[in-house]
């Protein structure tokens, strides 16, 4: 009897709250949210990216409690976190490795969208919000890379901020505004720390918009055809929550391996040397997730042209819904596009390799060919394939 009264009382409280703030209805919606019944494990990447973002925010907030954004103390404060803060080494490695894992997840998420045509109507805005999230992620990661104030941090900040000086007329004022002076110094570090703390919460807001856009027309699927009836769908919970947990398990196994066995594998040893404005590293290398764009930047001798191509390589993704003229979404039914897609993937990986190499021959000339194909894929190959390709017959149902 007492248990029944307690249960009714708790239900009454939940109903009272839900009537005024429908948070319980919102979570209940996920139990009944209908999704295509044929989604594969690549569709767990969105949930994994959400987990990665939460990990980055939690570890970042705790690390910020112990970090000192000052050029004389930043490097020492990071070393203090590693040595004197309880589990500071774990927090830092979780945050740094987590950034790489986050980007790896997002790159796979984007690749899945490219292959299955998730950018096509009516999901153009969903795609655009995703690319905006990617851009802010890149800005956040770059600013975070500067914070340890090692040699690679300092000189990467110097190289990237000086890129804006290539813009005619307004370039120099932009550089001074970014740096807070005529060079990378204490004001730069303070600004980057402040923005690095702010941007993840902007990403959270954009993720909410991303989910709203996703729920408007539902998920795409491997066949790329629209849901025609309820027999083509199943509830998100428990069918896809179970699948997501399998993906989480694989993700955390890989994550744990890098944290505990290879925490510095994806970093650069020069960043364990305190920043010295008088000593330039022999080879300035960004983090691995920036290297394809870095290779495009260095592919041409003109600084302005390099900056234009580097930013253009990202902004061309915004035009993708209109550059791909095919009416078929999924690459499973587009034999020529499927070949072009894998060539493009290989080209992106090759650009990443070239971005890690010194700016000398033969890497420069090879970078030009690779960068040329990168843009040709979007501006030439996709429009032509969409016009002349004969797709395979689409199935009638999922």
Curated annotation (Swiss-Prot):
A single GO molecular function term of this UniProt record: ubiquinol-cytochrome-c reductase activity
Protein localization: Cell membrane
Cofactor note: Binds 2 heme b groups non-covalently.
Main location: membrane
Membrane topology: Multi-pass membrane protein
Cofactor: heme b
Residues engaged in binding heme b b566: 109, 210
GO CC terms, sorted: plasma membrane; respiratory chain complex III
Protein role: Component of the ubiquinol-cytochrome c reductase complex (complex III or cytochrome b-c1 complex), which is a respiratory chain that generates an electrochemical potential coupled to ATP synthesis.
Subunit structure: The main subunits of complex b-c1 are: cytochrome b, cytochrome c1 and the Rieske protein.
Family: Belongs to the cytochrome b family.
Note: Heme 1 (or BL or b562) is low-potential and absorbs at about 562 nm, and heme 2 (or BH or b566) is high-potential and absorbs at about 566 nm.
Protein name per UniProt: Cytochrome b
Organism of provenance: Rickettsia typhi (strain ATCC VR-144 / Wilmington)
Lineage, broadest ranks: Bacteria, Pseudomonadati, Pseudomonadota, Alphaproteobacteria, Rickettsiales
Gene: petB
């Amino acid at each position: 009897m007492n248990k029944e009264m307690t249960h009714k009382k708790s239900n009454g409280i939940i109903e009272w709250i839900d009537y005024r703030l429908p948070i319980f209805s919102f979570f209940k919606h996920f139990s009944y949210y209908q999704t295509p019944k044929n989604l594969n494990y690549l569709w767990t990447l969105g949930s994994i990216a959400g987990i990665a973002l939460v990990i980055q925010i939690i570890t970042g907030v705790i690390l910020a409690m112990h970090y000192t954004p000052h050029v004389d103390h930043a490097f020492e404060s990071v070393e203090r976190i590693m040595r004197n803060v309880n589990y500071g080494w774990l927090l830092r490695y979780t945050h740094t490795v987590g950034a790489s894992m986050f980007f790896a997840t997002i790159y796979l998420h984007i690749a899945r969208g490219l292959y299955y045509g998730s950018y096509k109507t009516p999901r153009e805005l969903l795609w655009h919000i995703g690319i905006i999230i990617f851009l802010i992620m890149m800005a956040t990661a770059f600013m975070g890379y500067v914070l340890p104030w090692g040699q690679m941090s300092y000189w990467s900040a110097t190289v990237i901020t000086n890129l804006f000086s290539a813009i005619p007329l307004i370039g120099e004022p932009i550089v001074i505004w970014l740096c807070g002076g005529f060079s990378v110094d204490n004001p730069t570090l303070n600004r980057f720390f402040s923005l690095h703390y702010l941007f993840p919460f902007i990403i959270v807001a954009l993720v909410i918009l991303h989910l709203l856009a996703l729920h408007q027309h539902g998920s795409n699927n491997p066949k790329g055809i629209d849901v025609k009836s309820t027999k083509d769908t199943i509830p998100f919970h428990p069918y896809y929550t179970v699948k997501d947990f399998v993906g989480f398990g694989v993700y955390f196994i890989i994550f744990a391996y890098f944290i505990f066995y290879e925490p510095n594998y994806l970093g650069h040893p020069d960043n364990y040397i305190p920043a010295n404005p008088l000593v330039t590293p022999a080879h300035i290398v960004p983090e691995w997730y920036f290297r394809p764009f870095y290779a495009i930047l260095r592919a041409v001798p003109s600084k302005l042209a390099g900056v234009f191509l580097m930013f253009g390589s990202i902004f061309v993704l915004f035009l993708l819904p209109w550059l791909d003229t095919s009416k078929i979404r999924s690459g499973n039914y587009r034999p020529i596009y499927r070949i072009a897609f894998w060539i493009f993937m290989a080209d992106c990986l090759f650009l990443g390799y070239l971005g890690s190499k010194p700016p000398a021959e033969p890497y420069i000339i090879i970078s030009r060919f690779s960068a040329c194909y990168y843009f040709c894929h979007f501006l030439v190959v996709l429009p032509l394939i969409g016009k002349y390709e004969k797709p395979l017959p689409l199935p009638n149902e999922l």
